[in-house]
Each structure stands twice: as structure tokens, then as C-alpha cells.
């Protein structure tokens, strides 16, 4: 059974503790300047957006059938049995197909880096595999972000809507969108007002089904071996670059006494 997050925007107070907890868990810089940013980026995997007196989190939706994983030619993205959609930097060749395929515009790219990587929320896979909550759910002071089994969270969301019909829209965003996601959202207003795509636009069909239809149209005469050999070179070269960049970064941090 997939694990999931239930985010209830009606009890979110906009404290941004989820942002801070995420940054700490993923060794990301989080200071006043980062906290003030209102959009996601390669160094901010989740963001709490504000519209008047309403708040809304944006993060990777961890689709049950992730389009990003289906288009990745080297398997750098995959969904774990527990639910998180995770990223393997050692496999990534920087093609950015995942960015184009994501219905929720979640993967971000380190454009300014000499050794760029794709970045997004990975739902704390090590914690989840160990039976723990995600960092954002654990740190949330109001329970606006709750972690648990997807089926249980769906039932709880339905109960909340039934018991408080004047508080919530009669809708669980993520229940069926693109085949269902492991981030479920309850709200009093339209999530589309915060940048989420309309359900009617993305539909209920899992995105990989469209990927398969496109791949079926790829001509057989494409020189597959040149792609394979080229891919092997890129993967090998990529790993060397990643290792060198990480070593340089660690040396710089040690020299400057900084903590990331």
C-alpha cells in the first residue's frame, strides 16, 4: 500500500515549518532570503504560498503512475514500493525530459551550476522506508500535513468533507488526477488559484499511457546503438562530474566552515 501525504489547507497557518524541515532533511540552505521566496526552485523543494488569508503548499505530487519516470531514458527517476518518486543523480544525463513530462511542473534544474542536477521533493524515502513520517509532516505544528497510508488518508479526507461541508470544497485534489497521486489536498477554494493544473486539463488518465503511445510511433530505423553508446558515455562522464563537484563543494564548505 502506498504511503501518502494529506495536506489540509484550511488548518495551515503559513508558518513555513514544512519548508524549514524539508531543507534540513535534504541539506539545503534555508535562511531569511530563501524563506521569503514564494516559488519553488532547485534549492526549495516545497513552498507555502499565500493569497490573502489563505495558504497552499506546492510540492511534488508523487504520482501513482509518474510521467517523469516513464520518460526518463536511463531510469534516473523511479517510484519506490512505499510511494515516493525518487531521483538517482548518478544515472541522470541531464536530458530534462522529466521537466517537460510533469503535469505539475515539479522537477527543477540547477541551471546556474557547473554540474547541474534535477531537484524536487523526494518524500523522505529513507525515513518512509524506515517507518517514519516525512520531515514536513513531523514538524507541522497544526497537523495540516499528515503522513500515512494513502487509502486511510483518503477515507479521513472524505470524513472531513462530510462532517464539515461548509468548510471544504467537495473534492480531494490528487484522488484521481493523472491516475491518482500520493499527495492529497483538501481546500476551501480552488487549488488552481495557487498554480495547480485544473483537473479537467490533466484528466484522470495516467500520463505514462500517453508516453507509451508516443513511443509506439518512434521509427524502427532510428540508430538505437548510437543512442545506447552515447548514453553510456554521458552516464560515465556524468558520474565523474558529479563526484568531482561534490568533492569540491565539501572542500569549500570545510574551508569556509559553512553548513549546508
Where are these regions (language model features)?
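Non-ligating segments of multi-cofactor redox enzymes
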Residues: 1-260
Amino acid at each position: 500500500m502506498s504511503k501518502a501525504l494529506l495536506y489540509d489547507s484550511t488548518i495551515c497557518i503559513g508558518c513555513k515549518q514544512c519548508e524549514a524541515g524539508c531543507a534540513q532533511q535534504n541539506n539545503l540552505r534555508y535562511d531569511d532570503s530563501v524563506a521569503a521566496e514564494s516559488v519553488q526552485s532547485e534549492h526549495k523543494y516545497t513552498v507555502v504560498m499565500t493569497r490573502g488569508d489563505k495558504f497552499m503548499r506546492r510540492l511534488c505530487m508523487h504520482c501513482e503512475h509518474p510521467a517523469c519516470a516513464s520518460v526518463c531514458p536511463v531510469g534516473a527517476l523511479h517510484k519506490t514500493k512505499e510511494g515516493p518518486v525518487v531521483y538517482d543523480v548518478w544515472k541522470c544525463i541531464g536530458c530534462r525530459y522529466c521537466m517537460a513530462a510533469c503535469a505539475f511542473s515539479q522537477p527543477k534544474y540547477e541551471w546556474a551550476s557547473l554540474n547541474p542536477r534535477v531537484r524536487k521533493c523526494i518524500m523522505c524515502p529513507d525515513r518512509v522506508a524506515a517507518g517514519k513520517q516525512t520531515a514536513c509532516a513531523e514538524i507541522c505544528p497544526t497537523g495540516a500535513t499528515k503522513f500515512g497510508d494513502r487509502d486511510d488518508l483518503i477515507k479521513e479526507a472524505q470524513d472531513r468533507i462530510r462532517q464539515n461541508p461548509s468548510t471544504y470544497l467537495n473534492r480531494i485534489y490528487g484522488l484521481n488526477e493523472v491516475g491518482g497521486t500520493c499527495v492529497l489536498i483538501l481546500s476551501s477554494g480552488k487549488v488552481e488559484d495557487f498554480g495547480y493544473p485544473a483537473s479537467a486539463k490533466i484528466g484522470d488518465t495516467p500520463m505514462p499511457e500517453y508516453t507509451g503511445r508516443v513511443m509506439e510511433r518512434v521509427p524502427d530505423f532510428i540508430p538505437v546503438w548510437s543512442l545506447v553508446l552515447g548514453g553510456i558515455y554521458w552516464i560515465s562522464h556524468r558520474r565523474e562530474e558529479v563526484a568531482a563537484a561534490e568533492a569540491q563543494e565539501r572542500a569549500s564548505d570545510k574551508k569556509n566552515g559553512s553548513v549546508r
